[in-house]
């Protein structure tokens, strides 16, 4: 058999290939003699030859990456060999460090040489780079096939080493969820005021950590009847009064009591039963019986704490991180733990192995993965005593996220697991969260009912539900809203009914009754709705049996005392003027409400043209973007959020200074909840209504329902600045309208062209929106837009609130007087409104003319 000429070997691209893989070829390839008897059976007819390389160098790609990954053409053999010999002579002058190599012998196939596997023991191998040469003479026995196999493994190892810094950082720094809820550090407040309310000891510890030294009125009146007497609660309190903790603490207490009653006894023998694995030492367990066996003399609260919290260290770590990584990843739409570079687990570098060992390792890892999945499924099946114990229903997704965060903060030292089920997020992630069998679930009705219909095993048996909470209940049970909620409540009160279940219902407008529409009042058999009738109807829809405890702390006005209400009467076209004037004159964290999504989109485009970058929040947005905008709005001090009534209920955004009703709400309940986004927790806030001609009817209904004794004051506006404001708004409207029409036309025409191309038909000019695009007309439009934008930029570059100096005589310099900036904007809208009130009260009343008294004459 004729062998291939060995001189043609270096002409192949193997030199550059081996160089990029970390091996520098110094010598020549030599032919390996093969026994001719190996070709007798005819199975090796395709074999050409075997070649071996004995003279080479190990090169680190990190030392000189530019030379290893160079895109230059390969040099000729003679030139390359001469350059390598020169480099070797230059390197031989410097002392070379010998590296001890560990040999790992493998069983070789018959007729082939024994292959050697080397593992570098010197940690300075990567640092030495090109200055290292293998001194072992047996290294030359490595064949070209083995070199090709080991090279990709080295590349994989280097890729792993490159990820190690980020992996170590991700392992040390816990993943932090971005929420609009402010961070609270360990304040260690005095919680003696909570002890008479039967609050569990681990919850008291969390309250001290959060700095809640005293309960609010709604919490004082709710906790004792709910925890001690286990009564159903109908609670109505002002916005920002702490209703979340009023139902979260009784729910946590009910879960802890269930865990105490169903605590498993400790095992008598130390060996694990067959088919089960023994937990490792120091691992966190959820066996409350172990803590109970260790200390039988503890008080009841301490027993509960020990049962729910087997490891204080793990609980404190959970408190610092604010929950597990997977919980936060589920909340905010991030990838699962273990997906992506930020959640990788740092692994030790794997030593080089031959092909057989790599296959065995892959099989072993695959088997371990299957075993882990089987263990997870078995774990879900071996926890029959961890059912769903608490369920919280909320009307909006953002409110559900907030409620879960508050429950986690209070239950951080109890070991209770929570999960959130809302729309707009991955169903698979939420199913994996349910696989952990959380004791408490916070959900919106739609997604919860969807998972119940899919018959998830954690949601199959709701008879063991110990606590049901309906937050913002008046909105949840409104006719025409949340059809899934009525089906869910019907199931809970029929097939899944539990007589021991406790129901807690809360809302800021639970007892507020607004006037029904005229079309309903004119009907014959219409009953007038009052407070008692509304509560009875609510209890009937929710399915509350028995007589619950009603706690009503709302005022007649239904708004908080620290809220300042004001209004501006204007035309519909002038609302943009006053909105822009207010945002420029009184910067801060402002929340603007409108009744429709189209109005929000128009305002967003208009304000962006005016160099105000607002954030938006409405139902048509993606859930990730909604949460991201809320977090950014809470983080920035001077920011504007344009929102529909999605953001009106329950959201606790810190330090919102102004709430502006661009459109008057249709009902008084919506007005109360909108205004409740500011003036929370004894802070002051301002609520401004822009009332147009079409809003007068709704405004009168709200004024009548809230039983206002005094008229809402007018907000002071300095009319001398309105001319400049109107000019800016006029230009901005033209630019925004032109851009919007052009965008809609391009969108429509693009869709038409794609549809025509798919159908292979020709389009006529009248099918295009606005006619077929004319280059000359488009050029003229763009030129006009440039002129308008240039004029608007000139106006925006000048200060808006300025006062000109009026001089009686010509100036000495012969130039017009300079504009003097208006007083600083440190004065807030609240202080400006209070000054106006003081001026009105200080005006002396006009003296009335004295009436002449009738004279009396003596007879």
From Swiss-Prot:
<feature type="cross-link" description="Glycyl lysine isopeptide (Lys-Gly) (interchain with G-Cter in SUMO2)">
    <location>
        <position position="825"/>
    </location>
</feature>
<dbReference type="InterPro" id="IPR014001">
    <property type="entry name" value="Helicase_ATP-bd"/>
</dbReference>
<feature type="modified residue" description="N6-acetyllysine">
    <location>
        <position position="17"/>
    </location>
</feature>
<dbReference type="InterPro" id="IPR001650">
    <property type="entry name" value="Helicase_C-like"/>
</dbReference>
<dbReference type="GO" id="GO:0003723">
    <property type="term" value="F:RNA binding"/>
</dbReference>
<keyword id="KW-0539">Nucleus</keyword>
<keyword id="KW-0378">Hydrolase</keyword>
<protein>
    <recommendedName>
        <fullName>ATP-dependent RNA helicase DDX24</fullName>
        <ecNumber>3.6.4.13</ecNumber>
    </recommendedName>
</protein>
<feature type="cross-link" description="Glycyl lysine isopeptide (Lys-Gly) (interchain with G-Cter in SUMO2)">
    <location>
        <position position="808"/>
    </location>
</feature>
<feature type="region of interest" description="Disordered">
    <location>
        <begin position="61"/>
        <end position="175"/>
    </location>
</feature>
<feature type="compositionally biased region" description="Polar residues">
    <location>
        <begin position="823"/>
        <end position="834"/>
    </location>
</feature>
<feature type="compositionally biased region" description="Polar residues">
    <location>
        <begin position="799"/>
        <end position="814"/>
    </location>
</feature>
<keyword id="KW-0067">ATP-binding</keyword>
<feature type="domain" description="Helicase C-terminal">
    <location>
        <begin position="578"/>
        <end position="723"/>
    </location>
</feature>
<feature type="modified residue" description="Phosphoserine">
    <location>
        <position position="295"/>
    </location>
</feature>
<keyword id="KW-0832">Ubl conjugation</keyword>
<comment type="function">
    <text>ATP-dependent RNA helicase that plays a role in various aspects of RNA metabolism including pre-mRNA splicing and is thereby involved in different biological processes such as cell cycle regulation or innate immunity. Plays an inhibitory role in TP53 transcriptional activity and subsequently in TP53 controlled cell growth arrest and senescence by inhibiting its EP300 mediated acetylation. Negatively regulates cytosolic RNA-mediated innate immune signaling at least in part by affecting RIPK1/IRF7 interactions.</text>
</comment>
<feature type="modified residue" description="Phosphoserine">
    <location>
        <position position="94"/>
    </location>
</feature>
<keyword id="KW-0597">Phosphoprotein</keyword>
<comment type="subunit">
    <text>Interacts with FADD. Interacts with RIPK1; this interaction disrupts RLR signaling activation of IFN-dependent transcription factor IRF7. Interacts with NIP7. Interacts with EP300; this interaction prevents TP53 acetylation mediated by EP300.</text>
</comment>
<feature type="domain" description="Helicase ATP-binding">
    <location>
        <begin position="224"/>
        <end position="528"/>
    </location>
</feature>
<dbReference type="GO" id="GO:0005737">
    <property type="term" value="C:cytoplasm"/>
</dbReference>
<feature type="modified residue" description="Phosphoserine">
    <location>
        <position position="287"/>
    </location>
</feature>
<dbReference type="InterPro" id="IPR014014">
    <property type="entry name" value="RNA_helicase_DEAD_Q_motif"/>
</dbReference>
<feature type="compositionally biased region" description="Acidic residues">
    <location>
        <begin position="82"/>
        <end position="91"/>
    </location>
</feature>
<dbReference type="GO" id="GO:0016887">
    <property type="term" value="F:ATP hydrolysis activity"/>
</dbReference>
<feature type="compositionally biased region" description="Basic residues">
    <location>
        <begin position="95"/>
        <end position="105"/>
    </location>
</feature>
<keyword id="KW-0694">RNA-binding</keyword>
<feature type="region of interest" description="Disordered">
    <location>
        <begin position="799"/>
        <end position="859"/>
    </location>
</feature>
<dbReference type="GO" id="GO:0005524">
    <property type="term" value="F:ATP binding"/>
</dbReference>
<dbReference type="InterPro" id="IPR000629">
    <property type="entry name" value="RNA-helicase_DEAD-box_CS"/>
</dbReference>
<feature type="binding site">
    <location>
        <begin position="237"/>
        <end position="244"/>
    </location>
    <ligand>
        <name>ATP</name>
    </ligand>
</feature>
<feature type="compositionally biased region" description="Polar residues">
    <location>
        <begin position="106"/>
        <end position="115"/>
    </location>
</feature>
<keyword id="KW-0547">Nucleotide-binding</keyword>
<feature type="region of interest" description="Disordered">
    <location>
        <begin position="262"/>
        <end position="374"/>
    </location>
</feature>
<dbReference type="GO" id="GO:0003724">
    <property type="term" value="F:RNA helicase activity"/>
</dbReference>
<keyword id="KW-0007">Acetylation</keyword>
<feature type="compositionally biased region" description="Acidic residues">
    <location>
        <begin position="294"/>
        <end position="304"/>
    </location>
</feature>
<feature type="modified residue" description="Phosphoserine">
    <location>
        <position position="82"/>
    </location>
</feature>
<keyword id="KW-1017">Isopeptide bond</keyword>
<feature type="cross-link" description="Glycyl lysine isopeptide (Lys-Gly) (interchain with G-Cter in SUMO2)">
    <location>
        <position position="370"/>
    </location>
</feature>
<feature type="modified residue" description="Phosphoserine">
    <location>
        <position position="60"/>
    </location>
</feature>
């Amino acid at each position: 058999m004729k062998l291939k000429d060995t001189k043609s070997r270096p002409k192949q691209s193997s030199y550059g290939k081996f160089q990029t893989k970390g091996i520098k070829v110094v010598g020549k390839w030599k032919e390996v003699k093969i026994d001719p008897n190996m070709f007798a059976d005819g199975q090796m007819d395709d074999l050409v030859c075997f070649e071996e390389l004995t003279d080479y160098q190990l090169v680190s790609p990190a030392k000189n990456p530019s030379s290893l990954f160079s895109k230059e053409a390969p040099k000729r053999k003679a030139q390359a060999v001469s350059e390598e010999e020169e480099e070797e002579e230059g390197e031989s002058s410097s002392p070379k460090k010998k590296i001890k190599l560990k040999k790992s012998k493998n069983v070789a196939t018959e007729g082939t040489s024994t292959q050697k596997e080397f593992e570098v023991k010197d940690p300075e191998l990567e640092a030495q780079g090109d200055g290292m040469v293998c001194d072992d003479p047996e290294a030359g026995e490595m064949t070209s096939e083995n070199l090709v196999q080991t090279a990709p493994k080295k590349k994989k190892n280097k890729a792993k080493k490159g990820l190690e810094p980020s992996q170590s950082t991700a392992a040390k720094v816990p993943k932090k969820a971005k929420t609009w809820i402010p961070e609270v550090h360990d304040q260690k407040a005095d919680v003696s005021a909570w002890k008479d309310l039967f609050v569990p000891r681990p919850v008291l510890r969390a309250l001290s950590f959060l700095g809640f030294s005293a309960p609010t009125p709604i919490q004082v009146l709710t906790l004792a009847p709910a925890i001690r007497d286990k009564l159903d609660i109908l609670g109505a309190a002002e916005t920002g009064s702490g209703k979340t903790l009023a139902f979260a603490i009784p729910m946590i207490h009910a879960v802890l009591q269930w865990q105490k009653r169903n605590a498993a006894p400790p095992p008598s023998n130390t060996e694990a039963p067959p088919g089960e694995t023994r937990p490792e030492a120091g691992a966190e367990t959820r066996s409350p019986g172990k803590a109970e066996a260790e200390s039988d003399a503890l008080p009841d609260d301490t027993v509960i704490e020990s049962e729910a919290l087997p490891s204080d260290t793990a609980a404190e770590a959970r408190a610092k991180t604010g929950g597990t990584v997977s919980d936060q990843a589920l909340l905010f739409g991030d990838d699962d733990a273990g997906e992506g570079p930020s959640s990788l687990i740092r692994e030790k570098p794997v030593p080089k192995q031959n092909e057989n060992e790599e296959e065995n390792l892959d099989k072993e890892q695959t088997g371990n993965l299957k075993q882990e999945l089987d263990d997870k499924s078995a774990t879900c099946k071996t926890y029959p005593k961890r059912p769903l114990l608490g369920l919280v229903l909320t009307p909006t997704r953002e409110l559900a996220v907030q409620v879960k965060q508050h429950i986690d903060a209070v239950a951080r030292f109890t070991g209770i697991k929570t999960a959130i089920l809302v729309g707009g997020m991955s169903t698979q992630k939420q199913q994996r969260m349910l696989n952990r069998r959380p004791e408490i679930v916070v959900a919106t009705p739609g997604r919860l009912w969807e998972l119940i219909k899919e018959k998830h095993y954690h949601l199959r048996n709701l008879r063991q539900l110990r606590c049901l909470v309906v937050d913002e209940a008046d909105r949840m049970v409104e006719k025409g809203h949340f059809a899934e909620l009525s089906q869910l409540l019907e199931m809970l009160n029929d097939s899944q009914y539990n007589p021991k279940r406790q129901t807690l219902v809360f809302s800021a407008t639970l007892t507020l009754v607004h006037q029904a529409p005229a079309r309903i009042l004119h009907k014959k058999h219409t009953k007038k709705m009052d407070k008692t009738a509304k509560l009875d109807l609510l209890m009937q829809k929710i399915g509350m049996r028995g007589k619950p405890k009603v706690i009503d702390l709302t005022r007649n006005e239904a708004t908080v005392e620290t809220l300042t209400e004001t209004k501006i009467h204007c035309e519909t076209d002038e609302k943009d003027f006053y909105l822009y004037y207010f945002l420029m004159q009184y910067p801060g964290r402002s929340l603007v409400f409108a009744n429709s999504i189209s109005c929000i989109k128009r305002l967003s485009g208009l304000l962006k043209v005016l160099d105000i970058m607002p954030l938006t929040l409405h139902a048509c947005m993606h859930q990730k973007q909604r949460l991201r905008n809320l977090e950014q709005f809470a983080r920035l001090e001077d920011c504007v959020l344009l929102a529909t009534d999605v953001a009106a209920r329950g959201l606790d955004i810190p330090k919102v200074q102004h709430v502006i009703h661009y459109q008057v709400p249709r009902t008084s309940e919506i007005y109360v909840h909108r205004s409740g986004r500011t003036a929370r927790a004894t802070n002051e806030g301002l609520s401004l209504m822009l009332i147009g001609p079409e809003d007068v009817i709704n405004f009168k209904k709200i004024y009548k329902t809230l039983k206002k004794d005094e008229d809402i004051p007018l907000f002071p506006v300095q009319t001398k600045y309105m001319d400049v404001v109107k000019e800016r708004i006029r230009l901005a409207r033209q630019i925004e309208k032109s851009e919007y029409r052009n965008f809609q036309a391009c969108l429509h025409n693009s869709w038409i062209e794609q549809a025509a191309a798919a159908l292979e038909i020709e389009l006529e000019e009248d099918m295009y929106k606005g006619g077929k695009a004319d280059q000359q007309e488009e050029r003229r439009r763009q030129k006009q837009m440039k002129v308008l934008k240039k004029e608007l930029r000139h106006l925006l570059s000048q200060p808006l609130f300025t006062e000109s100096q009026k001089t009686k005589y010509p100036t000495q310099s012969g130039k017009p007087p300079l504009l003097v900036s208006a007083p600083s904007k440190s004065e807030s809208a609240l202080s400006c409104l209070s000054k106006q009130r003081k001026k009105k009260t200080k005006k002396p009343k006009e003296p009335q003319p004295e009436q002449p008294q009738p004279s009396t004459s003596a007879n």
